[in-house]
């Protein structure tokens, strides 16, 4: 007879182990890996307790990760570490999200207003240097704008306004060609450029700069390789 503790341990392993598959509509020879939202962990800011303002909701359509920022909280970023054997293989990232509360006047293209209802970041690393593309669902920033560019010895980062405004509570699907995006933003459009390891995916909702509430749900993260 299997003990209750053994059953719980087995369930945790099953839930945290990503399972590759090929989805209908994906080109032959490519596989899809679902990233379980239960496996996202705090990577910036507080790491435990009520200060971590994210939790998993077991919704009828599947699990989702919900973030609800309140003024006065320290900003927390959640992250998923990509398995080492896939870091050079990933072609696309897919997910769905819905805004639940827009930070008042949040505008990532203006200093001091850079709060987002939701963001998804893709991180590559070569040696000590990080390359980050942050895709945001903004309150009011112009759709398609690229803002908050940073270029230092250890960090290259761009923020892309992927969605702006709109109704709350409405799911939107997203697809990003991550290899093409790296080439366009960090390699001057050189299709032959060497792409560093894609090491992680992050997400965040925040309202610390505008001192306002913000919130979002994320679900159905997948990488295509």
Give the residues covered by each predicted segment.
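Solvent-exposed strand-to-loop "edge" motifs in beta-rich extracellular domains
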Residues: 96-102, 125, 179
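Bacterial N-terminal signal peptides
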Residues: 8-18
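Short carbohydrate-recognition loop motifs
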Residues: 55-75
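Extracellular carbohydrate-recognition regions
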Residues: 24-48
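Extracellular beta-strand elements of beta-rich domains used
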Residues: 201, 219-223
């Amino acid at each position: 007879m299997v003990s209750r503790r053994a059953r719980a341990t087995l369930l945790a392993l099953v839930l945290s182990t990503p399972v590759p598959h090929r989805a209908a509509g994906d080109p032959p020879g490519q596989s899809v890996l679902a990233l379980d939202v239960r496996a996202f962990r705090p990577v910036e800011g507080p790491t435990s307790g009520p200060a971590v303002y994210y939790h998993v909701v077991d919704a009828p359509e599947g699990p989702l990760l919900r973030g609800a920022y309140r003024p006065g909280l320290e900003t927390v970023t959640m992250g998923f570490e990509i398995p080492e054997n896939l870091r050079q293989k990933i072609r696309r990232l897919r997910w769905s999200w819905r805004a639940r509360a827009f930070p008042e006047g949040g505008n990532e293209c203006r200093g001091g207003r850079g709060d987002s209802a939701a963001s998804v970041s893709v991180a590559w690393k070569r040696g000590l240097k990080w390359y980050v593309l942050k895709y945001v669902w903004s309150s009011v920033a112009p759709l398609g704008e690229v803002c908050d560019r940073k270029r230092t010895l250890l960090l290259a980062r761009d923020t892309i306004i992927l969605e702006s405004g709109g109704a709350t509570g409405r799911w939107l699907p997203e697809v990003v060609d991550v290899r093409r995006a790296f080439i366009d933003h960090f390699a001057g459009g050189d299709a032959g450029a060497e792409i560093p390891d894609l090491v992680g995916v992050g997400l965040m909702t925040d309202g610390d700069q505008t001192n306002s509430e913000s919130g979002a749900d994320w679900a159905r993260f997948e990488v295509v390789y």
